[in-house]
């Protein structure tokens, strides 16, 4: 009977250890996925910044050209 108890405790202990290791690996994988998601969102933000900057430049040039044309027409 004592042998059976020791065997059962050993099996339970090894099961808990393996479960603990699996949980730790799962947490590490989740952390890596979160970091990848953060990197992707940063890349998206950077691309949006560039896009909006280019739109701003184009709009500014268009307004400047319009104003310049109006001024030139007024001088004539």
Swiss-Prot record:
Entry-linked Pfam families: DD_K, FSAP_sig_propep
Acidic residues: bias regions: 30-41
Keywords of this entry: Amidation, Amphibian defense peptide, Antibiotic, Antimicrobial, Cleavage on pair of basic residues, Cytolysis, Fungicide, Hemolysis, Immunity, Innate immunity, Membrane, Secreted, Signal, Target cell membrane, Target membrane
Tissue specificity comment: Expressed by the skin glands.
Disordered, as annotated region: 24-44
Keyword Signal: yes
Principal subcellular localization: secreted
Record-given protein name: Dermaseptin-SP2
Upper lineage: Eukaryota, Metazoa, Chordata, Craniata, Vertebrata
């Amino acid at each position: 009977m004592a042998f059976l108890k020791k065997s059962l405790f050993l099996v339970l202990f090894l099961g808990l250890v393996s479960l603990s290791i699996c949980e730790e690996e799962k947490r590490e994988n989740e952390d890596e996925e979160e970091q990848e998601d953060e990197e992707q969102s940063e890349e998206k933000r950077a691309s949006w910044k560039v896009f909006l900057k280019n739109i701003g430049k184009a709009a500014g040039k268009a307004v400047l050209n319009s104003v310049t044309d109006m001024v030139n027409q007024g001088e004539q």
